[in-house]
From Swiss-Prot:
Protein name: Urease subunit gamma
Quaternary structure note: Heterotrimer of UreA (gamma), UreB (beta) and UreC (alpha) subunits. Three heterotrimers associate to form the active enzyme.
One protein family per Pfam: Urease_gamma
Lineage of source species: Bacteria, Pseudomonadati, Pseudomonadota, Alphaproteobacteria, Rhodobacterales
Chief site of localization: cytoplasm
Keywords attached to this entry: Cytoplasm, Hydrolase
GO terms of biological process kind: urea catabolic process
TM regions (residue ranges): none
Gene of this entry: ureA
Keyword presence, Ion transport: no
InterPro entries: Urease_gamma, Urease_gamma/gamma-beta_su, Urease_gamma_sf, Urease_subunit
Source species: Roseobacter denitrificans (strain ATCC 33942 / OCh 114)
Cytoplasm is among the record's keywords: yes
PANTHER family: UREASE (PTHR33569:SF1)
One of the record's GO cellular component terms: cytoplasm
């Protein structure tokens, strides 16, 4: 299977998000990379489902809460920017203060 660098990045993020979901299910708090992966994956999948950019900006901020993260992680993540493929093309989605 030949994958482009972008496809490899998407696959890596998807796998990291899956690991984060399993850890949350076990009650383990997320670290910085896991939190970013989970938020990013939610935005990418929502875009693929046909949701709007504005909708994904809001939805991305509701993926995880402060209680689900290790201490200090929410303060480290001010913005998450994701290039997501929407039905009308690829767009940059910025989620401000994603962990509330």
């Amino acid at each position: 299977m030949q994958l482009t660098p972008r496809e490899k990045d998407k696959l890596l993020i998807s796998m990291a998000a899956e690991v984060a979901r399993k850890r949350l299910a076990r009650g383990v708090k997320l670290n910085h990379p896991e939190a970013i992966a989970l938020i990013t994956d939610a935005v990418v999948e929502g875009a693929r489902d046909g949701r709007s950019v504005a909708d994904m900006m809001e939805a991305g901020a509701q993926v995880i809460t402060r209680d689900q993260c290790m201490e200090g992680v929410p303060e480290m993540i001010h913005d998450v920017q994701v290039e997501a493929t929407f039905p009308d093309g690829t767009k940059l989605v910025t989620v401000h203060n994603p962990i509330r």
